[in-house]
Regions:
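Short glycine-rich phosphate-binding loop at a beta-alpha junction
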Residues: 176-187, 333
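Helical "lid/coupling" subdomains associated with nucleotide-phosphate turnover
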Residues: 139-148, 152-156, 160-166, 191-195, ...
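Short acidic-glycine loop/turn motifs at beta-strand connectors
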Residues: 8-10, 52, 64-65, 113-116, ...
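Fe-S ferredoxin-like electron-transfer domains
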Residues: 53-100, 107
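Phosphate/pyrophosphate-binding loops at sites that engage ATP/ADP/AMP, CoA/4′-phosphopantetheine
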Residues: 161-180
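Local cysteine-cluster metal-coordination motifs and their immediate loop/turn environment
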Residues: 33-65
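Phosphate-binding loop and its immediate beta->loop->alpha context
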Residues: 72-89, 124-159
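Gly/Thr-rich phosphate-binding beta-strand-loop-beta motif of the actin/hexokinase/Hsp70
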Residues: 91-130, 255-273
Length: 386
C-alpha cells in the first residue's frame, strides 16, 4: 500500500492506494470525483490530472508512494431547474415531499409542501456516478465487471440524493421528520441502480429489466417511502412516463412528439390513443467524450465559432477557453469546411495542402495528420473530425 498526496483548490489530502490500483480507482474510493466518460478505459481523455507536475490520465497511472497529484478545479454545469407551474392535487395532506430527477449525468431534487403543493427548494448537481462512466452502458459494464459494483454505484447515488434532500430541508429550516414521501424518476437503468437491482438483463437481448416498477418496492430514504415512476421498457424509463404525465400530451388528440434529450436519449410519439417509444444511447456526446479538446457546456467551453478575416469565438462564462462543447464543435467544423481546411471526404488537411491564409492555424501530429489550433490550448485533430 502506498500514500499519495492530492492537491485540490488550495487544500491537500493524503490517500492510500492498493498495490496495482490505478489512480482513478484510488481517487474514487477516497471520495474524489473525476470525469471518466469511458468508464476508465483510457479512451475519452477526460480524467487528466497532474502527477508530479506531469499531465497524465488517472485511469492509466498506477501511482508510486509519495506521488503528488493535482486535480483540476472543474466548474459545475448550468442545470435547468425551471419547470411549468403544476396545479396541486395534494388536498389535505401534510408534511413535505421530495421530487428527484435522477439523470445519467445530472441529479435534481425539489422539495414541496404537500398541503397546497408549494415549492420550497431546488438543488441540482452532477451525478456522482459519472466517475464510473458517462453513459448507462458504461455503468452496466461496471456492475458486471467489478465485484460488488452494483452495490457500490447504488450506495454512491443514494448517499448523494440523501445529502441533497437533507440540504434542501436544512435550507428551508425543516426537519427530516417532516419528510413524508420521495418520488424518483429516471431512466430504467438509473432506477434499477438506485434500487440496487441487477441490470445485466437490460444489457443483453431481449433487454428485459428486473422490474418496470409498476408496484412500490418498499424502499425507504431518510425514513420516508420512495415511490418510483413506472418504466416502459429496458431503455424507456420512468422519466418518460413522468414527462408525458406532467406535459399532458397523453390527453391531446392528434400526434405529439415528446423528446428527452440527455445522455440516454428517449422519445415518445403519439397522443390520446397511445404512444410509440424508442431510445438511443447518446452516450457522453454532450460532455465531449472522444474529442481531444471536448468538454461539457460549462464555463470555459467554446460555444460558437465563426470566421471573419480570422477565427472569432464565444466562451461560456467569458473566461479563457478550455475546450469545445457540442455547439462550438459543429460551428468550428462548418467554418473549416467553408475555409477549405476540411475536404469533401471529411479529411482535415495538413498545412501544406490547405489554403495559404489558413496555414498558420495548422500543424501535423506525430502521425502526420492535420491539427487545427483555435488557440494555444484548444485544437481540433483529424481524428476528431472523422
Amino acid at each position: 500500500m502506498s500514500s499519495v498526496r492530492v492537491l485540490l483548490g488550495g487544500k491537500s489530502f493524503d490517500i492510500k492506494t492498493e498495490d496495482g490500483e490505478t489512480l482513478l480507482s484510488a481517487l474514487r474510493r477516497s471520495g474524489f470525483t473525476l470525469p471518466a466518460a469511458c468508464g476508465g478505459r483510457g479512451k475519452c481523455g477526460k480524467c487528466r490530472v497532474g502527477v508530479n507536475s506531469v499531465s497524465r490520465l488517472a485511469c492509466r497511472v498506477v501511482p508510486n508512494d509519495g506521488d503528488v497529484v493535482t486535480l483540476p478545479e472543474k466548474s459545475g454545469g448550468r442545470i435547468l431547474t425551471q419547470t411549468p407551474e403544476i396545479v396541486s392535487c395534494a388536498g389535505k395532506m401534510s408534511g413535505l415531499a421530495a421530487a428527484v430527477d435522477l439523470g445519467t449525468t445530472t441529479v435534481a431534487v425539489r422539495l414541496y409542501e404537500l398541503a397546497g403543493g408549494r415549492e420550497l427548494k431546488t438543488i441540482s448537481a452532477w451525478n456522482a456516478q459519472a466517475a464510473y462512466g458517462g453513459d448507462v452502458i458504461s455503468r452496466i459494464q461496471y456492475t458486471m465487471e467489478t465485484p460488488n459494483g452494483l452495490n457500490e454505484l447504488s450506495r454512491i447515488i443514494r448517499a448523494q440524493i440523501e445529502d441533497m434532500i437533507s440540504r434542501a430541508l436544512e435550507d428551508c429550516g425543516k426537519s427530516k421528520s417532516e419528510l413524508r414521501h420521495t418520488v424518483l424518476v429516471g431512466n430504467t437503468v438509473m432506477q434499477h441502480i438506485f434500487a440496487s437491482l441487477p441490470v445485466e438483463g437490460i444489457a443483453r437481448a431481449p433487454f428485459k429489466p428486473e422490474t418496470l416498477f409498476e408496484i412500490d418496492c418498499n424502499d425507504v430514504l431518510l425514513d420516508a417511502p420512495v415511490h418510483y415512476s413506472p418504466c416502459v421498457a429496458g431503455y424507456v424509463g420512468g422519466d418518460i412516463t413522468a414527462g408525458l404525465l406532467s406535459s399532458g400530451l397523453y390527453k391531446k388528440p392528434g400526434r405529439s412528439l415528446f423528446l428527452d434529450i440527455g445522455t440516454n436519449g428517449e422519445m415518445a410519439l403519439g397522443g390520446s390513443d397511445g404512444f410509440a417509444c424508442c431510445a438511443v444511447a447518446s452516450g457522453p456526446a454532450f460532455e465531449g467524450a472522444g474529442i481531444s479538446c471536448g468538454m461539457a457546456a460549462v464555463d470555459g467551453a467554446v460555444s460558437h465559432v465563426r470566421y471573419d478575416g480570422g477565427f472569432l469565438y464565444d466562451v461560456i462564462g467569458g473566461d479563457a477557453p478550455c475546450g469545445l462543447c457540442g455547439s462550438g464543435l459543429i460551428d468550428l467544423a462548418a467554418a473549416l469546411i467553408d475555409c477549405g481546411c476540411i475536404d469533401e471526404g471529411g479529411r482535415l488537411l495538413p498545412p501544406e495542402e490547405a489554403p495559404e491564409k489558413m496555414r498558420r492555424y495548422l500543424t501535423r501530429d506525430e502521425n502526420g495528420n492535420g491539427v487545427f489550433h483555435l488557440t494555444r490550448e484548444v485544437c481540433l485533430t483529424a481524428q476528431d473530425v472523422r
